[in-house]
């Protein structure tokens, strides 16, 4: 299973790289991602019958999890409010114009929801879930699944050491709650709005991928590790700091609730 989906994910990354997020390619990407989600679920339920996947299930129980969805959205919003605000104040980015291309905004909103469902189901629901079910410690399982999450982005444009480290930290941040709750709604909503706010709304690249019609057009100043001009906000030291803080808060909160 892991080999098949590692190969599939690499093909998916190449497809994004080839077509970009231009509007004439977004619909195709949306359909392709929808197909990927369907294939993932079909494979999971087929292989679950032979006990090769997490016995605990994927983590899509929705009852009582509305606060997790809201929480993930709020965390992403607050993180980018601080990150974008600090970057503007420091002069690393400047807003040049604003528009609201509703078709692009809506389509990418749906696209990044499917991306979040796919990646969180695969990396957290299946990979991390299987590692935890095997008796592996929470820390080791979280580290291994986060490394895989970062490796799956190796083919993205402008990938380098800092984006690798930050995507690893993003994997830890997204998986931190799952090791306690075994539920995906918080990481899905956080991942969803993380990507959507970063690219289509604020005008950064998303993991190195340029967004064609963002709401904000921004100009970058200073070195890449401060401005995120090539890879996006995920390629900045400020992102590193904020993710470490957010991850610490998530783990601390989960330890309080799920003792």
Language-model-derived ranges and their functions:
Residues 1-54, 199-259:
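N-terminal, membrane-interfacial amphipathic/helix-forming hydrophobic leader that caps
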Residues 2-9, 80-84, 146-154, 193-201:
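Aromatic-anchored segments of alpha-helical transmembrane domains
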Residues 7-30, 53-121, 128-134:
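Juxtamembrane helix-loop-helix connectors linking adjacent transmembrane helices
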Residues 30, 69-74, 105-106, 139-144, ...:
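Hydrophobic alpha-helical transmembrane segments
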Residues 30-42, 102-110, 118, 122, ...:
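Membrane-embedded alpha-helical segments of multi-pass membrane proteins
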Residues 80-83, 112, 116, 138-154, ...:
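Small-polar-interrupted transmembrane alpha-helices in polytopic inner-membrane proteins
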Residues 118-144, 176-183:
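Membrane-interface helix/loop boundary segments of multi-pass membrane proteins
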Residues 163-224:
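Functionally important transmembrane alpha-helices
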